[in-house]
Amino acid sequence: MNKKRRRSNPLLIILLAGAIIFLVYFNVMVVPGMNPPFVPTPTETRDPVSFEIEAQNLATEGKFIAAIEAYKQAINANPKKIDNYLNIARIQIYSGDYAQAQVSAENAVLLKNDNAEAYALLGWAKGMQQMYLEGEKDAKTAISLNPNSALAHAVYAYILALRVEAGMNELNTMDLAIEESRTALALDANLLEARWARGYVLEITSNYADAVEQYEIAVQLNSNIAQLHLALGRNYMALGQNDEAIFEFTKAYSLNPTDPMPNYFI
């Protein structure tokens, strides 16, 4: 006796075929684009140059704190680029953070120990922290590396003037400060630091009107540095131009509210 043949179920066949097609599609098209479980989704890496551009723009706008943070990100993204250390050190000096400026400049020296700008900024940062002899040594090193560096001569002049004001000068310290400030200007009359140093040398020699002229040019080159406005205000006050002095002291305070000196003069 023959067994009755079992009839196929068309619906079951259709469902099985659909399941097979779905599995094939899932493995070929979907799985390759999925991340494994518990693995974070990769994020797009930002171009290190974009941090530098952002920092430069912020610095130009006078937003020094934000610019410093952007330069820190640029350094993290590209720790071997010396320009970022030099730029952040300069802005840290502008904003009065001399200790951190020293660290940044020291890192620049570690990266390239024959860079005149790195030594000049290091000397400036030290000088502003009353480490006059150490700062002077770094400034001299900068000049020996690049005798045509206006920045190096300006920093050297400024530190010598600081020594005179602090009563730590020798017989020829003032004469040397005057000479170095003139050399810096002769090398680059458009360098802010050259005008700043020349103004300071003139100030401590009581040439207040000439100092005002130099500080005013420096402010035109960068109007966002509190110390420049403070210096300009001091010299206006010495000339008896009290309204102008108060304006500059107020501007200095608005740029750096943590500095008590503007309020002291006001």
Residue ranges, per PLM feature:
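Canonical tetratricopeptide repeat
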Residues: 87, 121, 155, 197, ...
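Alpha-helical adaptor scaffolds
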Residues: 90, 158, 200, 234-238
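Helix-start (N-cap) detector for alpha-helical repeat units in TPR-like alpha-solenoids
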Residues: 48-49, 82-83, 116-120, 150-154, ...
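Short coil loop/turn residues that delineate tetratricopeptide repeat
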Residues: 46-47, 80, 114, 131, ...
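Alpha-helical segment of the N-proximal tetratricopeptide repeat
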Residues: 46-83, 87-97, 128, 162-166, ...
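Long, contiguous interaction/recruitment modules in multidomain scaffold/adaptor proteins
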Residues: 1-47, 132-133, 137-147, 151-161, ...
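Structural signature of tandem alpha-helical TPR/SEL1-like repeats
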Residues: 62-69, 95-107, 129-141, 164-183, ...
